[in-house]
Design a protein with these regions (language model features):
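Active-site-proximal helix/loop segments of hydrolytic enzymes
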Residues: 1-130
Length: 130
């Protein structure tokens, strides 16, 4: 976590003791990793209706671009261009559209269930039905 103090997102770490800042950052990252896994499960569930999955579970990796301490992040693999069947499907516009719609549905479903505070979705979910 200490390597990310320069990339603390919206966390209030400026002027804090370095040890305290590291603890706050580690706590935020742990929460964000859990949220990222939930988001990944939501997207993977939608993709399983569209294409064969290489892995039927969400995997974790330490990609630097996926380490924002305050934003759930996922990397979606939709196929391998080195695989002829995958490559053929990825060249098909209809298949790409279905993949995009599945990814969108997974992201949308995740955020509808867990709307970020102060967001449009949070405001919608706070309104009484009717």
């Amino acid at each position: 976590g200490a390597d990310l103090i320069g990339n603390s997102g919206n966390l209030p770490l400026q002027g804090r003791d370095k040890v305290l800042a590291g603890v706050i950052l580690d706590m935020a990252l742990s929460s964000t990793i859990a949220s990222s896994l939930d988001l990944g499960h939501s997207v993977l569930g939608q993709l399983s209706d569209v294409t064969a999955l290489h892995q039927k579970r969400v995997e974790q990796a330490g990609f630097a671009v996926l380490k924002s301490p305050d934003i759930p992040s996922i990397l979606v693999e939709t196929g391998f261009i080195s695989n002829r069947g995958d490559c053929r499907r990825l060249m098909d516009e209809h298949h790409r559209q279905r993949l995009a719609e599945a990814i969108f549905a997974g992201v949308q479903g995740y955020f509808r269930q867990r709307p970020p505070a102060g967001s449009y979705l949070a405001a919608l979910s706070a309104q009484p039905p009717g």
